[in-house]
Every structure is written in C-alpha cells, then in structure tokens.
C-alpha cells in the first residue's frame, strides 16, 4: 500500500465497511455521545446512580465528573456488585465511595483498533472518550462500549 502512496488511513476512508476499514475508523466516528451517556457527580446517591446507569443508551456504566465537568472516575456494574457484596448499608453511600479513580480513557481521534486492544488488555467493557487536542482535555466527550466494537473485528 505505502509504495503507491496509499496509506492505511486512505484504506479506511475508501473502504469504511471492510474489516480493516472498520478497525481503522476513529473512535469519534462510533462513540456514544451527548444524551446517550450518563455522567454523575461524586456525591450522587447510590439510588440515583442505579437509575442513571439503567436509563441511558450506554447501560452498566457512568462517568463521574467534578464541578468543572472534568472526568475524575467511572462506576461500572461490576463496581456496584463488588460494593454491594462488601457493604451492609450501601444506600448510605455516594459515587465517590464506589468509583474507580483515574479510569482508562481513549482519545476521540484514536483508531478503533487501539480501543479494542486497551479494553482486552485491561479486561474492561467501557472506555470514556476524551478530546485530548481540545482546550479542556479532561472533559469527557463520549463513551465507547466493547460490545459495539465487536462488529469491527
């Protein structure tokens, strides 16, 4: 490909439905965004967390943001299950008691292949998407779910 000046990115652009084309697409082209994804604050109650995590297109995860809307954590259904097993009064807790701090993230301009690799390596189902080229690189712009990426394999 490179001998003729035809790059992998050109291939992805001209063959977007092919296996290689799908794997080379950018995260921003397939991520869930805006009203499809739940975000909560550190002091959100467990009851509200559960409601949000089941009310959005992205189910089973919620990003945790601070007052500036910067990402500070994530709560997944696995985090909730582990928390419930250890606590006899879980409904007195809030998001910051449950969340995974410094969650794995991916840049909006990264290829799908990188997200698949990161998720498989870390055994996670959801990545929060950041736009690291923006003026606010810690503000989440979307989420990508492993199940959605399986169609790119």
Language-model region placement:
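Oxyanion-binding "anion nests"
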Residues: 30-69, 76
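Bateman (tandem CBS) regulatory domains
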Residues: 23-37, 92-103
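Helical hairpin unit composed of two closely spaced alpha helices linked by a short loop
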Residues: 61-110, 114-117
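Terminal peptide-recognition signature
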Residues: 30, 53, 69, 98, ...
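Internal, active-site/partner-interface "lid" segment
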Residues: 2-32
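The conserved cystathionine-beta-synthase
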Residues: 40-58, 84-87, 105-133, 143, ...
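Short hydrophobic beta-strand motif reused across regulatory alpha/beta modules
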Residues: 73-78, 141-149
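Short hydrophobic beta-strand segments in globular cytosolic domains
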Residues: 37, 71-72, 81, 135, ...
């Amino acid at each position: 490909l490179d001998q003729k000046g035809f790059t992998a990115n050109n291939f992805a652009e001209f063959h977007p439905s092919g296996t290689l084309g799908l794997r080379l697409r950018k995260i921003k082209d397939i991520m869930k965004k805006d009203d499809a994804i739940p975000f909560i604050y550190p002091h959100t109650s467990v009851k509200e967390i559960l409601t949000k995590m089941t009310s959005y297109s992205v189910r089973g995860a919620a990003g945790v943001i601070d007052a500036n809307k910067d990402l500070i954590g994530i709560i997944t259904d696995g985090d909730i299950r582990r928390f419930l097993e250890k606590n006899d009064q879980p409904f007195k807790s809030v998001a910051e008691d449950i969340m995974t701090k410094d969650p794995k993230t991916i840049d909006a301009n990264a290829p799908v292949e990188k997200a698949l690799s990161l998720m498989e390596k870390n055994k996670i189902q959801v990545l929060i998407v950041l736009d690291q080229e923006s003026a606010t690189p810690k503000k989440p712009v979307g989420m990508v779910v492993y199940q959605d990426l399986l169609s790119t394999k």
